[in-house]
Amino acid sequence: MKHRIGRVEGEILRELTKILRKDIRDPRLSDITITAVECTNDLSYATIYYSLLTEDPAKEKEVAEGLDKAKGMMRHLLGQTLTVYKVPELIFKRDTSVAYGSKIDNLINQVKKQDQERENKNK
């Protein structure tokens, strides 16, 4: 059963990415990336994780509103391509791991830069 859920999750991820690029014309959704999909065991709900390249709270709210507005159309289009009896209800959540990873990367780069400056002063 878990293998089937994983396969459906991958299929939803692939199809939603296509739908966002080709069928949804909302400019609020142009900068998002679908990062993961998690389905419940009975496939009645699918949690869709997405990332943004910005940390602007106003932009985050716009994207959330755009996703909520386009949810019905996305579910309808998914129903045309998915090989499941019932299309899962879509729940969108922001994936903050990408932003967190970027923040950690910046901190590491700052520490490296400080170390190099200290080495140059000691020479």
Curated annotation (Swiss-Prot):
GO terms for biological process: maturation of SSU-rRNA. One of its GO terms (molecular function) is ribosomal small subunit binding. The keyword Cytoplasm applies. Keywords: Cytoplasm, Ribosome biogenesis. GO terms for cellular component: cytosol. Signal peptide: none annotated. Disulfide bonds: none annotated. It is found in: Cytoplasm. Its main location: cytoplasm. Gene3D superfamilies: 3.30.300.20. The keyword Cytoplasm applies. Monomer. Binds 30S ribosomal subunits, but not 50S ribosomal subunits or 70S ribosomes. One of several proteins that assist in the late maturation steps of the functional core of the 30S ribosomal subunit. Associates with free 30S ribosomal subunits (but not with 30S subunits that are part of 70S ribosomes or polysomes). Required for efficient processing of 16S rRNA. May interact with the 5'-terminal helix region of 16S rRNA. Belongs to the RbfA family. This is Ribosome-binding factor A. It comes from Lactobacillus gasseri (strain ATCC 33323 / DSM 20243 / BCRC 14619 / CIP 102991 / JCM 1131 / KCTC 3163 / NCIMB 11718 / NCTC 13722 / AM63). The gene is rbfA.
